[in-house]
Amino acid sequence: MDNSSGQNSRTASSASTSKIVNYSSPVSPGVAAATSSSSSSSSSGMSSSQEDTVLGLFTPKKEFPNAKMLQTIREKLMTPGGACDLLALGIAAEPTDQQPVKLIQQRYLISAQPSHISAAVAAKTPASYRHLVDLTASNLRCVDIFTGEQFLCRIVNEPLHKVQRAYFQLQQHDEELRRSTIYGHPLIRPVHDIIPLTKDRTYILIAPVPQERDSTGGVTGVYENLHTYIRHAKRLCETEARAIFHQICQTVQVCHRNGIILRDLKLKRFYFIDEARTKLQYESLEGSMILDGEDDTLSDKIGCPLYTAPELLCPQQTYKGKPADMWSLGVILYTMLVGQYPFYEKANCNLITVIRHGNVQIPLTLSKSVRWLLLSLLRKDYTERMTASHIFLTPWLREQRPFHMYLPVDVEVAEDWSDAEEDEGTAADAMDDDEEGLCPLGDKHEYEDIGVEPLDYTRSTLQMAQNANGLSTEPEPDTDVDMG
């Protein structure tokens, strides 16, 4: 088939199907030549109907991936000379609603959904702070052409070797550290494959969580993210929030130890993987910065404005990455306990001003230990913030124990009930005798053993800390604000 006849056939095919819109992107001369040669060789022995099948690689978004579409691509890849980048594919529901489709590694088909940031929102964002809004975020869906498996696809703005090194350290080293000390599950979702996109960008294909029964009888899988969960629950009690926040802090700790700055740390990044909504996993390293050494000085400012640290909103070009992550941890903890963000303004300009002042109102209804932890995380001066290596020494998080430690599995039942009651009474008397020597959160010697002085949680101490931060001690009205 010569070029003129192939062109006429394509014109007739597009005219017969009104909802088929060819999508083509610029290609290099080498790829274009390979595409042209493969098309001519594969179409030489085909009938008109078979050629229409090959060219009609378009389907509505809700039907992606279409079985017929995948079968067509399989046949093309198995055709001699057909192993080339298919840069002329696309799926569309309407002629004006196009979605590019890309084939990578001759195996994975990636579909890019439209950005969730509208043009109106982008126009209202001040130019000087536009880096705080992810204007190019897209929901990438990936399917294995040969097995039909579907994966989440994310893009990391780091070269391939750095992403491979980071995931190798997270998944191969520190087996005990990368698992939750409460439930024992992996804190970061494993990846299925890591593929280079450009010299400085990398695809990561996230493996799905298998559906199976866990030890408690619940079904594992991927459930809603933490942001959605809190919107429905309004706010969490301290006991539930402690178990969840413990897993989040452990995730940040293991990343910081391996030279990974998460940067875009927020509630939507964490997903529940059990039916009881107790186990959390961090989705991926999308938006993260992988360090080459110990210096965590960064210049690229990204992240959600509601979680952004004050130093990112200052004129300085650089900032420290690890303290910025700790500020985001404070915002996450505050939102879980109060049911609203500590800094919330409908207009981004006002929000930036509020965050730069660093004034946060902490309700007095919270316990003293968690109020002190919030004050330690939401410090305007980043040099005074709590670090990931010290956060587990705080009394509020030290109250969290692994779930199996709450079950008295090793308790022996006494044969004589009278003897058991007598022993119980003796133990209660001993506790009463020692009560005067204990502080509310434990013995002083308990903290000295780990090199940490006991914290003074008197009202005057909290008053001084709040005055130093410009905080008011008046109780906050018990109202909910839409989390947006």
Curated annotation (Swiss-Prot):
Biological process (GO), any one: positive regulation of cell size
Reported tissue expression: Expressed throughout the brain with highest levels of expression detected in the cell body rind and lower levels of expression detected in the neurophil (at protein level).
Name of protein: Tribbles
Gene: trbl
Domain Protein kinase: from-to ranges: 129-397
Leftover remarks: 'tribbles' is named after fictional small round organisms from the Star Trek universe that proliferate uncontrollably.
GO molecular function, one term: mitogen-activated protein kinase kinase binding
Lineage: Eukaryota, Metazoa, Ecdysozoa, Arthropoda, Hexapoda
Subunit structure: Interacts with slbo. Interacts with Akt1.
Consequences of knocking out this gene: Low viability with only 14% of mutants survive to adulthood. The egg chambers of surviving females often have only eight germline cysts half of which have an oocyte and the other half do not. Early stage 9 to stage 10 embryos, display increased levels of slbo. RNAi-mediated knockdown in embryos produces premature mitosis in part or all of the ventral region, resulting in many mutants displaying defects in gastrulation including partial invagination of the mesoderm. RNAi-mediated knockdown results in an increase in phosphorylated Akt1 but has no effect on total Akt1 levels.
Organism: Drosophila melanogaster (Fruit fly)
Location relative to the cell: Nucleus; Cytoplasm; Cytoplasm, Cell cortex
